[in-house]
């Protein structure tokens, strides 16, 4: 399992966003050298030696994009830190696709799988722990529905 540098320090920005007051770092234990290189290529801040992904201070996120009707089962706060790391990865992957760094939709799917796997590892590393059934439900949801977010042409707020 990976590890986060700290708890999430963010300020609410109505109507649905949060702004990070401090950088959020996630050190992955499963990211391969090839995956690190792919992420660096598309603009994700990840160290080449320790596989630490950094989300900078000031980053704007919606935490987890969970429909309110599902909050009784998976509230956005259950997987918030993992979701923030996932958000920035999707944003950078989308940007790299638009700039031609990622050349095909099939290649973008490879990057999306890496981001989704980091989301799962982040939930597995969370303190307090996220129950396994919630991890699996959230992971399956991003695998099933994340393609719409990553294929979106709408700009994210980011930094």
Can you name each region flagged by the protein language model?
Residues 1-159:
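Extended terminal accessory/targeting regions
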């Amino acid at each position: 399992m990976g590890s986060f540098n700290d708890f999430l320090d963010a300020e609410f920005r109505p109507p649905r966003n949060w702004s990070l007051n401090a950088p959020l770092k996630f050190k992955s234990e499963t990211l391969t050298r090839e995956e690190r290189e792919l992420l660096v290529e598309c603009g994700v801040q990840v160290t080449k030696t320790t596989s630490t992904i950094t989300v900078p201070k000031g980053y704007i996120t919606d935490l987890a994009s969970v429909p309110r009707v599902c909050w009784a089962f998976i509230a956005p706060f259950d997987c918030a830190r993992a979701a923030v790391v996932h958000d920035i990865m999707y944003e950078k992957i989308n940007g790299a696709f638009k700039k031609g760094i990622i050349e095909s939709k099939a290649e973008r799917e490879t990057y999306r799988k890496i981001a989704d796997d980091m989301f799962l590892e982040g939930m597995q590393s969370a303190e307090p722990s996220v129950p396994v059934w919630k991890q699996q439900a959230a992971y399956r949801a991003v695998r099933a529905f994340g393609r719409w977010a990553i294929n979106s042409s709408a700009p994210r707020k980011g930094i």
